[in-house]
A protein has these predicted regions:
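A polyampholytic, Gly/Pro-enriched intrinsically disordered region
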Residues: 84-96
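Long, charge-dense
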Residues: 71-82
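Structural motif
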Residues: 5, 40-41, 89-92
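Conserved mixed alpha/beta catalytic, RNA-binding, or beta-rich assembly cores of soluble enzyme
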Residues: 1-25
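Mid-chain, well-packed structural core segment of small domains
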Residues: 31-68
């Protein structure tokens, strides 16, 4: 078990900060490569307590929308988006 980053064609182990609210754009951009996704879904474990406005603004600067939700909801959303053929990346915090 652990946190993962899921791209449309690959999944990678991810070591984000222990607290999702301390996540910053520099924790993410190196994992996106040269082709930034239009959407980043962040599954924060349990119910999100922080709207993560600073991270959202930083991602928007790169043309990436941010959706923050529980990890189970992020998994469901990811599955729907992939079934629709959409491009997105999801970061899933391990559920403690």
């Amino acid at each position: 078990s652990g946190s993962v980053l899921v791209h449309p064609r690959q999944t990678a182990i991810w070591t984000p900060p222990a607290k999702p609210e301390t996540l910053v754009i520099d924790d993410l951009l190196p994992h996106f490569g040269d082709d930034f996704p239009p959407l980043f879904i962040l599954g924060v474990g349990g119910a999100p307590m922080d709207p993560m406005n600073n991270l959202s603004a930083a991602l928007r600067h790169h043309g990436i929308a941010l959706e923050v939700m529980s990890t189970p909801a992020a998994c469901r959303t990811w599955n729907v988006l992939m079934s629709e053929g959409r491009n997105a990346v999801t970061g899933l915090y391990d559920i403690a």
